[in-house]
From Swiss-Prot:
Signal sequence range: none
Cross-referenced HAMAP family: HisI
Cofactor note: Binds 1 Mg(2+) ion per subunit. Binds 1 zinc ion per subunit.
Cofactor entry: Mg(2+); Zn(2+)
Subcellular location: Cytoplasm
GO cellular component, one term: cytoplasm
Binding site for Zn(2+): C83, C100, C107
Enzyme class: hydrolase
Protein name: Phosphoribosyl-AMP cyclohydrolase
Gene3D superfamilies according to UniProt: Phosphoribosyl-AMP cyclohydrolase (3.10.20.810)
Taxonomic placement: Bacteria, Pseudomonadati, Pseudomonadota, Betaproteobacteria, Rhodocyclales
Function: Catalyzes the hydrolysis of the adenine ring of phosphoribosyl-AMP.
Annotated source species: Aromatoleum aromaticum (strain DSM 19018 / LMG 30748 / EbN1)
Reaction catalysed by this enzyme: 1-(5-phospho-beta-D-ribosyl)-5'-AMP + H2O = 1-(5-phospho-beta-D-ribosyl)-5-[(5-phospho-beta-D-ribosylamino)methylideneamino]imidazole-4-carboxamide
């Protein structure tokens, strides 16, 4: 990513009433959807400037540099805005191959079955106890 000369581009994003926009992180090489998170204006600006995904943690009420604890950073290759300008898509390279705090490649590891249950379909790549020491 490169350092934008101005921040006018941020004005084109349709922020919600809390100043947030939903963000989808998609692995560029495979097309896999890895996670969903939120960004505020500062997070999106810093993501564009640094080339690494920085989100807004609603639970911690602070910026969250993805991988700051685990080392599983997301290198941002492309930032896209949807047709309504209210969802951001990050095309990323997932360092370490793990995006989910459960130790899986993707946060979307549960599949709905016709009987109304959920099935875990993706394995744990690394035990979270070994990631977050």
């Amino acid at each position: 990513m490169s350092r934008p000369n101005s921040v006018r581009w941020l004005n084109e994003v349709q922020w919600d009433d809390q100043g947030l926009v939903p963000v989808i992180a998609q692995e560029a090489a495979s097309g896999d959807v890895l996670m969903f998170a939120w960004m505020n204006r500062e997070a999106l600006q810093r993501t564009a400037e640094t080339g690494e995904a920085i989100y807004w943690s609603r639970s911690r009420r602070r910026l969250w540099h993805k991988g700051e604890e685990s080392g599983h950073i997301q290198k941002v290759l492309e930032i896209r805005l949807d047709c309504d300008s209210d969802v951001v898509l990050l095309k990323i390279e997932q360092i370490g191959g793990i995006a989910c705090h459960t130790g899986r490649h993707s946060c979307f590891f549960q599949r709905y079955l016709a009987d109304g249950s959920w099935e875990t379909v993706d394995p744990v790549v690394k035990d979270p106890k070994d990631i977050y020491k």
